Amino acid sequence: MGSYYSTESTKSNESNETTNNVEGIVDTIGGTVESINSDGIITTSENIVEIVLKENNQPTIFETQESNILEIVTTKIDVLKKILRLIGEVTSECQFSFQNVNEGGRIIVTELHDNKTILLKLVLKGTGFDFYKCSKSKITARLYLPDIDEALGLIGVDDTNTNPIIISMKKDKETSIFITRIDNSGFTEQVELPCRESVGLNIPLPKTTFQGKIVINAEKFRKICERICSVSDLIKISLTDKEVSFSARYYNLDFRYKHSVESKVLGQTIENYFFIDGMLKFIKYFQSSDEISIYIKKDFPLVIHGPFDNFGSIYVFTSPIEE
Protein backbone atom coordinates (compact mmCIF):
# COMPACT_ATOMS: atom_id res chain seq x y z
CA MET A 1 0.00 0.00 0.00
CA GLY A 2 1.60 3.21 -1.13
CA SER A 3 1.62 6.54 0.63
CA TYR A 4 0.69 9.70 -1.26
CA TYR A 5 1.88 12.09 1.40
CA SER A 6 5.29 13.05 2.74
CA THR A 7 6.56 15.39 5.44
CA GLU A 8 9.84 15.86 3.64
CA SER A 9 10.80 19.33 2.48
CA THR A 10 9.67 18.91 -1.10
CA LYS A 11 7.56 21.45 -2.92
CA SER A 12 4.25 20.29 -4.33
CA ASN A 13 3.49 20.72 -8.01
CA GLU A 14 2.19 24.25 -8.56
CA SER A 15 0.51 23.55 -11.89
CA ASN A 16 -2.47 25.49 -13.14
CA GLU A 17 -4.71 22.44 -13.24
CA THR A 18 -8.03 22.83 -11.54
CA THR A 19 -9.49 20.21 -9.27
CA ASN A 20 -13.17 20.25 -10.23
CA ASN A 21 -14.32 22.84 -7.71
CA VAL A 22 -11.78 21.91 -5.03
CA GLU A 23 -9.11 24.46 -5.89
CA GLY A 24 -9.35 25.68 -2.32
CA ILE A 25 -7.80 22.45 -1.10
CA VAL A 26 -4.37 23.63 -2.15
CA ASP A 27 -3.93 27.34 -1.65
CA THR A 28 -1.31 29.89 -0.81
CA ILE A 29 -1.59 33.00 1.27
CA GLY A 30 -1.19 35.94 -1.04
CA GLY A 31 -1.54 38.93 1.25
CA THR A 32 -2.92 40.38 4.44
CA VAL A 33 -5.59 42.80 5.50
CA GLU A 34 -5.32 45.39 8.20
CA SER A 35 -8.71 45.12 9.90
CA ILE A 36 -10.86 42.13 10.69
CA ASN A 37 -14.46 42.23 11.84
CA SER A 38 -16.89 39.33 11.96
CA ASP A 39 -20.61 39.69 11.38
CA GLY A 40 -22.53 41.24 14.24
CA ILE A 41 -19.64 43.24 15.75
CA ILE A 42 -20.12 46.96 16.29
CA THR A 43 -16.95 48.91 17.01
CA THR A 44 -17.61 51.53 19.67
CA SER A 45 -14.03 52.71 20.23
CA GLU A 46 -10.52 51.62 19.42
CA ASN A 47 -10.42 48.79 21.95
CA ILE A 48 -14.04 48.33 23.06
CA VAL A 49 -16.38 46.31 20.87
CA GLU A 50 -19.94 45.18 21.38
CA ILE A 51 -20.37 41.59 20.24
CA VAL A 52 -23.73 40.02 19.51
CA LEU A 53 -23.16 36.45 20.66
CA LYS A 54 -24.20 33.88 18.08
CA GLU A 55 -25.27 31.41 20.77
CA ASN A 56 -28.12 33.47 22.24
CA ASN A 57 -28.15 36.66 20.13
CA GLN A 58 -27.28 38.65 23.25
CA PRO A 59 -24.94 41.68 23.09
CA THR A 60 -21.88 41.70 25.31
CA ILE A 61 -19.00 44.16 25.75
CA PHE A 62 -15.51 42.91 24.97
CA GLU A 63 -12.32 44.89 25.44
CA THR A 64 -9.58 43.90 23.06
CA GLN A 65 -6.04 44.07 24.39
CA GLU A 66 -3.34 45.79 22.36
CA SER A 67 -0.86 43.44 24.03
CA ASN A 68 -2.60 40.47 22.37
CA ILE A 69 -1.66 39.53 18.83
CA LEU A 70 -4.38 36.87 18.77
CA GLU A 71 -7.89 37.05 20.22
CA ILE A 72 -10.75 34.64 19.55
CA VAL A 73 -14.06 34.91 21.40
CA THR A 74 -16.68 32.15 21.32
CA THR A 75 -19.47 30.63 23.39
CA LYS A 76 -19.36 27.44 21.33
CA ILE A 77 -17.45 25.21 23.75
CA ASP A 78 -19.16 22.15 22.28
CA VAL A 79 -17.82 23.04 18.83
CA LEU A 80 -14.31 23.55 20.22
CA LYS A 81 -14.45 20.07 21.74
CA LYS A 82 -15.75 18.68 18.45
CA ILE A 83 -12.79 20.26 16.66
CA LEU A 84 -10.42 18.53 19.09
CA ARG A 85 -12.12 15.16 18.57
CA LEU A 86 -11.95 15.58 14.80
CA ILE A 87 -8.24 16.42 14.77
CA GLY A 88 -7.65 13.68 17.36
CA GLU A 89 -8.73 11.09 14.79
CA VAL A 90 -5.43 11.84 13.05
CA THR A 91 -2.97 13.07 15.68
CA SER A 92 -2.58 14.03 19.33
CA GLU A 93 -0.33 17.01 18.63
CA CYS A 94 -1.52 19.63 16.20
CA GLN A 95 -0.16 22.76 14.55
CA PHE A 96 -2.72 25.57 14.24
CA SER A 97 -2.17 28.28 11.64
CA PHE A 98 -4.07 31.45 12.58
CA GLN A 99 -4.23 33.70 9.54
CA ASN A 100 -5.13 37.30 8.83
CA VAL A 101 -6.73 37.19 5.39
CA ASN A 102 -9.78 38.53 3.62
CA GLU A 103 -13.32 37.71 4.76
CA GLY A 104 -12.61 37.74 8.48
CA GLY A 105 -9.52 35.60 8.87
CA ARG A 106 -9.25 31.84 9.25
CA ILE A 107 -7.61 28.97 11.09
CA ILE A 108 -6.07 26.11 9.12
CA VAL A 109 -5.06 22.68 10.39
CA THR A 110 -3.29 20.23 8.07
CA GLU A 111 -2.30 16.96 9.72
CA LEU A 112 -1.15 13.59 8.42
CA HIS A 113 -2.07 10.31 10.12
CA ASP A 114 0.83 8.26 11.48
CA ASN A 115 0.27 5.58 8.84
CA LYS A 116 0.46 8.26 6.13
CA THR A 117 -2.71 7.03 4.39
CA ILE A 118 -5.09 9.71 5.69
CA LEU A 119 -4.59 13.46 5.46
CA LEU A 120 -6.93 15.92 7.16
CA LYS A 121 -7.30 19.58 6.28
CA LEU A 122 -9.62 21.67 8.43
CA VAL A 123 -10.37 25.27 7.44
CA LEU A 124 -12.23 27.35 10.06
CA LYS A 125 -13.57 30.79 9.15
CA GLY A 126 -12.91 33.64 11.56
CA THR A 127 -16.52 34.76 11.05
CA GLY A 128 -17.71 31.52 12.60
CA PHE A 129 -16.54 32.81 15.98
CA ASP A 130 -18.08 35.71 17.89
CA PHE A 131 -14.88 37.72 17.47
CA TYR A 132 -11.60 37.02 15.69
CA LYS A 133 -8.46 39.15 15.65
CA CYS A 134 -5.08 38.14 14.29
CA SER A 135 -2.60 41.03 14.22
CA LYS A 136 -0.03 39.20 12.08
CA SER A 137 -0.38 37.72 8.63
CA LYS A 138 0.08 34.30 10.22
CA ILE A 139 0.58 32.97 13.74
CA THR A 140 1.59 29.35 14.25
CA ALA A 141 0.99 27.46 17.48
CA ARG A 142 1.66 23.76 18.01
CA LEU A 143 -0.33 22.33 20.91
CA TYR A 144 -0.92 19.00 22.60
CA LEU A 145 -4.62 18.25 22.14
CA PRO A 146 -5.20 16.61 25.56
CA ASP A 147 -3.88 19.83 27.15
CA ILE A 148 -6.53 21.88 25.33
CA ASP A 149 -9.25 19.41 26.26
CA GLU A 150 -8.19 19.57 29.91
CA ALA A 151 -8.21 23.38 29.82
CA LEU A 152 -11.72 23.47 28.36
CA GLY A 153 -12.81 21.04 31.05
CA LEU A 154 -11.39 23.25 33.80
CA ILE A 155 -13.07 26.48 32.73
CA GLY A 156 -16.01 25.20 30.72
CA VAL A 157 -17.52 22.76 33.21
CA ASP A 158 -20.24 25.14 34.48
CA ASP A 159 -23.20 24.83 32.11
CA THR A 160 -24.92 27.83 33.74
CA ASN A 161 -22.07 30.14 32.75
CA THR A 162 -23.03 31.95 29.54
CA ASN A 163 -19.87 34.06 29.35
CA PRO A 164 -17.74 33.41 26.27
CA ILE A 165 -14.30 31.82 26.22
CA ILE A 166 -11.38 33.95 25.03
CA ILE A 167 -8.42 32.32 23.29
CA SER A 168 -5.42 34.63 23.05
CA MET A 169 -1.69 34.99 22.52
CA LYS A 170 0.34 37.84 23.99
CA LYS A 171 2.69 39.97 21.94
CA ASP A 172 5.52 39.45 24.42
CA LYS A 173 4.83 35.74 24.97
CA GLU A 174 4.33 33.93 21.70
CA THR A 175 5.24 30.64 23.36
CA SER A 176 1.86 30.24 25.05
CA ILE A 177 -1.85 30.22 24.27
CA PHE A 178 -4.17 31.52 26.99
CA ILE A 179 -7.76 30.35 27.48
CA THR A 180 -9.77 32.74 29.67
CA ARG A 181 -13.32 32.93 30.98
CA ILE A 182 -15.19 34.94 33.63
CA ASP A 183 -17.25 32.73 35.95
CA ASN A 184 -20.70 33.53 37.36
CA SER A 185 -19.14 35.13 40.44
CA GLY A 186 -17.12 37.59 38.37
CA PHE A 187 -13.77 35.84 38.88
CA THR A 188 -11.48 35.45 35.89
CA GLU A 189 -10.36 31.88 35.19
CA GLN A 190 -7.35 31.45 32.95
CA VAL A 191 -5.31 28.49 31.75
CA GLU A 192 -1.92 28.93 30.07
CA LEU A 193 -1.05 26.32 27.45
CA PRO A 194 2.63 26.10 26.51
CA CYS A 195 3.20 25.85 22.77
CA ARG A 196 5.40 23.04 21.60
CA GLU A 197 8.16 23.64 19.12
CA SER A 198 6.62 24.41 15.75
CA VAL A 199 7.79 22.25 12.92
CA GLY A 200 8.13 23.34 9.34
CA LEU A 201 5.37 21.13 8.00
CA ASN A 202 5.54 20.79 4.26
CA ILE A 203 2.84 18.26 3.51
CA PRO A 204 2.07 18.48 -0.21
CA LEU A 205 -1.65 18.03 -0.69
CA PRO A 206 -2.40 15.80 -3.67
CA LYS A 207 -3.32 17.99 -6.62
CA THR A 208 -4.89 16.84 -9.84
CA THR A 209 -7.84 17.16 -12.18
CA PHE A 210 -10.39 14.73 -10.78
CA GLN A 211 -12.38 12.52 -13.13
CA GLY A 212 -15.58 12.46 -11.14
CA LYS A 213 -17.52 14.25 -8.44
CA ILE A 214 -20.16 12.53 -6.30
CA VAL A 215 -22.61 14.67 -4.33
CA ILE A 216 -24.45 12.72 -1.65
CA ASN A 217 -26.25 13.33 1.63
CA ALA A 218 -23.89 12.79 4.57
CA GLU A 219 -26.34 10.62 6.51
CA LYS A 220 -27.01 8.42 3.49
CA PHE A 221 -23.30 7.93 2.86
CA ARG A 222 -22.71 7.16 6.54
CA LYS A 223 -25.38 4.43 6.50
CA ILE A 224 -23.92 2.91 3.34
CA CYS A 225 -20.46 2.83 4.89
CA GLU A 226 -21.75 1.33 8.15
CA ARG A 227 -23.56 -1.47 6.32
CA ILE A 228 -20.55 -2.26 4.17
CA CYS A 229 -18.33 -2.13 7.26
CA SER A 230 -20.46 -4.90 8.80
CA VAL A 231 -19.34 -7.33 6.09
CA SER A 232 -15.92 -6.05 4.97
CA ASP A 233 -12.94 -3.88 5.88
CA LEU A 234 -12.78 -2.56 2.32
CA ILE A 235 -15.16 -0.52 0.20
CA LYS A 236 -14.97 -0.50 -3.59
CA ILE A 237 -16.11 2.69 -5.30
CA SER A 238 -16.94 2.27 -8.99
CA LEU A 239 -17.79 5.31 -11.08
CA THR A 240 -19.18 5.66 -14.59
CA ASP A 241 -20.54 8.75 -16.33
CA LYS A 242 -24.04 8.02 -15.02
CA GLU A 243 -23.72 6.02 -11.82
CA VAL A 244 -21.59 5.32 -8.78
CA SER A 245 -21.69 2.09 -6.81
CA PHE A 246 -20.36 1.41 -3.32
CA SER A 247 -19.71 -2.28 -2.82
CA ALA A 248 -17.91 -4.96 -0.83
CA ARG A 249 -17.08 -8.62 -1.29
CA TYR A 250 -18.71 -10.91 1.28
CA TYR A 251 -17.57 -14.51 0.78
CA ASN A 252 -18.94 -15.25 -2.72
CA LEU A 253 -21.43 -12.39 -2.70
CA ASP A 254 -21.13 -8.83 -3.96
CA PHE A 255 -22.84 -6.36 -1.61
CA ARG A 256 -23.62 -3.20 -3.59
CA TYR A 257 -25.34 0.22 -3.32
CA LYS A 258 -25.93 2.36 -6.40
CA HIS A 259 -26.35 6.11 -6.70
CA SER A 260 -27.05 8.28 -9.77
CA VAL A 261 -24.33 10.81 -10.46
CA GLU A 262 -23.06 13.28 -13.04
CA SER A 263 -19.35 12.81 -13.71
CA LYS A 264 -16.67 13.32 -16.34
CA VAL A 265 -15.62 9.69 -16.76
CA LEU A 266 -16.73 9.71 -20.43
CA GLY A 267 -17.55 6.10 -21.14
CA GLN A 268 -15.01 4.46 -18.87
CA THR A 269 -15.23 2.97 -15.40
CA ILE A 270 -13.08 4.02 -12.45
CA GLU A 271 -12.64 1.55 -9.61
CA ASN A 272 -10.70 2.13 -6.40
CA TYR A 273 -10.59 0.28 -3.06
CA PHE A 274 -10.35 2.05 0.29
CA PHE A 275 -10.34 1.09 3.95
CA ILE A 276 -13.88 1.75 5.12
CA ASP A 277 -12.81 2.56 8.69
CA GLY A 278 -10.84 5.57 7.48
CA MET A 279 -14.02 7.07 6.02
CA LEU A 280 -16.28 6.30 8.96
CA LYS A 281 -13.94 8.14 11.32
CA PHE A 282 -14.72 11.43 9.63
CA ILE A 283 -18.24 11.06 8.22
CA LYS A 284 -19.66 11.28 11.74
CA TYR A 285 -18.44 14.89 11.99
CA PHE A 286 -20.83 16.03 9.27
CA GLN A 287 -24.39 16.88 10.21
CA SER A 288 -27.02 14.46 8.89
CA SER A 289 -28.52 17.12 6.61
CA ASP A 290 -25.17 18.12 5.07
CA GLU A 291 -24.38 17.45 1.45
CA ILE A 292 -20.84 16.21 0.98
CA SER A 293 -18.77 16.02 -2.19
CA ILE A 294 -16.55 13.07 -3.02
CA TYR A 295 -13.86 13.60 -5.66
CA ILE A 296 -12.40 10.55 -7.34
CA LYS A 297 -9.70 9.62 -9.83
CA LYS A 298 -8.20 6.27 -10.75
CA ASP A 299 -5.25 5.34 -8.49
CA PHE A 300 -5.39 8.67 -6.66
CA PRO A 301 -6.44 9.63 -3.13
CA LEU A 302 -10.16 10.03 -2.63
CA VAL A 303 -11.19 13.47 -1.34
CA ILE A 304 -14.24 13.89 0.90
CA HIS A 305 -15.26 17.53 1.32
CA GLY A 306 -18.08 18.99 3.37
CA PRO A 307 -19.08 21.73 5.82
CA PHE A 308 -18.06 21.75 9.47
CA ASP A 309 -21.05 23.20 11.33
CA ASN A 310 -21.06 26.91 10.41
CA PHE A 311 -17.34 27.23 11.04
CA GLY A 312 -15.76 26.14 7.77
CA SER A 313 -14.90 23.02 5.80
CA ILE A 314 -13.38 19.58 6.22
CA TYR A 315 -11.22 17.92 3.58
CA VAL A 316 -10.25 14.27 4.05
CA PHE A 317 -7.77 12.60 1.69
CA THR A 318 -7.60 8.81 1.89
CA SER A 319 -5.27 6.66 -0.18
CA PRO A 320 -6.53 3.85 -2.43
CA ILE A 321 -5.21 0.37 -1.78
CA GLU A 322 -4.72 -2.78 -3.79
CA GLU A 323 -7.53 -5.29 -3.55
Swiss-Prot record:
Domain of life: Viruses
Cited InterPro entries: DNA_clamp_sf, Pr_cel_nuc_antig
Lipid modification (N-myristoyl glycine), residues: 2
GO MF annotations, alphabetized: DNA binding; DNA polymerase processivity factor activity
Methyltransferase listed as a keyword: no
UniProt keyword annotation of Lipoprotein present: yes
Residue ranges of the region described as Disordered: 1-21
Keywords, ordered alphabetically: Lipoprotein, Myristate
Gene3D superfamilies in the cross-refs: 3.70.10.10
Record GO biological process: leading strand elongation; regulation of DNA replication
Name this polypeptide is given: Uncharacterized protein L823
